[in-house]
Amino acid sequence: MSRVGKYPVEVPAGVQVSVADGFFKAKGKLGELTVPVSRHVEVKIEGSNVSVAPVGRRSRENWTMWGTTRALIANTVKGVSDGFSKGLEIQGTGFRAAVQGSNLVMNLGFSHDVVYPIPEGIKITTPRPTAIVVEGNDKQRVGQVALDIRSFRKPEPYKGKGVRYETEVLRRKEGKKK
C-alpha cells in the first residue's frame, strides 16, 4: 500500500495557500488553482507545509483519498509556482506544426491542415517545425491538450510517422516478408 499521503507538501515562497468550504486554493506567480477536498480527509496548513490526514476510522475510502488529495495538492502548488510542460515530436515527411494567432496549425499528411484552437490558460510553442511544447499551470489540462494533439495522428509502428511525446519509446514492427 502506498504511503504518499503521510509526506507534507512544501509551499515555496511566493505561493499563498488556503482551505475553505471544502476547497484548497493556491495562488502564485502563474495564476490561481482550486482543488476540491474530499470529506474523507482533513487538510492542515502549518507554516510553509500542507499536511493531509485521513478522517475517522481506517477505511478504504479514507486511505485512498488520503494519497490522492495529497498528490492533487502537490500538483496545484507546483503548478502555480513552476508550471508544467509536455513536449511532443512530429515525425514524417512534410509533417510540421506552427502557431498562427490562437490556433495550432499542423500538416500531418492529410489533404487538409489540422487546426487546433489553443485553450484558455494553455501556452503552445513550436521551437522548431517538428516540435511542440504545451505549457500551463494545471497538470491535468496540459496532459489532456497534449493527448488531443497526439490523437490527430498517433505514431504508427511500421515507419514511426505521427505525433509522439518526446519521452515516448515507440515499439517498431517489421514489415511483411515475401
Swiss-Prot record:
It holds the Pfam family Ribosomal_L6. One of its GO terms (molecular function) is rRNA binding. The keyword Kinase does not apply. Keywords: Ribonucleoprotein, Ribosomal protein, RNA-binding, rRNA-binding. GO terms for biological process: cytoplasmic translation. GO terms for cellular component: cytosolic large ribosomal subunit. Signal peptide: none annotated. This protein binds to the 23S rRNA, and is important in its secondary structure. It is located near the subunit interface in the base of the L7/L12 stalk, and near the tRNA binding site of the peptidyltransferase center. HAMAP family: Ribosomal_uL6_B. Belongs to the universal ribosomal protein uL6 family. Part of the 50S ribosomal subunit. This is Large ribosomal subunit protein uL6. It comes from Gluconobacter oxydans (strain 621H) (Gluconobacter suboxydans).
